């Protein structure tokens, strides 16, 4: 919604009407001034809901109501895969919700998750382009995916994609569900001739901003180019070994980790879990470690992540907290709250994945 507000206030952009769909409680302050021009809808993330289907129907209705010579401006960012949906026939909302929860809880990466979403959708994977009927369209995108691929961002509703799902990437129950539904094909490449897509913000921008600020604070800064992904347990081992051998200063990474959740997880998200695992690794060391989502949310919580140091576990022990139980139960958020190591920023309005920062003194 922050993108919408910027477009509405830009002197060179003239918007006759618009539709804004964002996460609940994430509407940008200031949009209320434009209620005569735009309609604002709030939807659900990370698991789609009935509201997501209603927003999908509203989006298609909005496009279909426009004139043949009207031009479109789409502002896409992370979360669109869940916020807006129009599922294929023969696939129910309950099935979609259960499948999404299974994919998220088992640690699949965003590419594999969005490939599934495209399979069961009538708008993802370039299919929304069919509703535009070759009208001139500009797509401005904030990337929240590895390597900034427009086909993956918000599941690529306006990017041509005829790739097939690699069934070898999934467990049997998910593979069986994929085989049971015949997907709708992506429109012909000719339907994309009037669509111009540009990425206007990405993870590298946030990493370079951290580097610049660190230098202003007189830190020696080290910008790590490798993209951080994979299970948080493996990543904690990687960061621990790295920090054991690296130079003193500010070390910067970016990416998006994953967590395999127990049947009944507690409070937290991937960043909070990684931070708690690192609290154990850096115990009694002169290191500060932060992992946080740039959008201000981490998993199904209102917190961004966690920031820990060499004394975090000792604080927990003083409060008689067994950090191993909190890790096992994926309840890192409650541990961080009790040890004052929770990062809570509120919605930032921008999502370019996660930042991981470490200061070695």
Label for each model-derived stretch:
Residues 19-22, 74-78, 139-145, 154, ...:
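Short beta-strand segments
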Residues 23-68, 116:
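Glycine-rich oxoanion-binding loops at beta->alpha junctions
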Residues 42-51, 104-132, 298-326:
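Proline/glycine-rich low-complexity loops and linkers
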Residues 3-32, 42:
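Active-site cofactor/substrate anionic-group-binding motifs, chiefly glycine-
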Residues 21-25, 227-229, 257-303:
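Active-site catalytic microenvironments in core metabolic enzymes, especially phosphate/sugar-handling
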Residues 276-361:
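Internal helix-turn-beta structural module
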Residues 89-176:
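Internal gly/pro-rich beta-alpha loop/helix module
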Residues 132-138, 154, 159-235:
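Accessory alpha-helical/coil subdomains and C-terminal extensions
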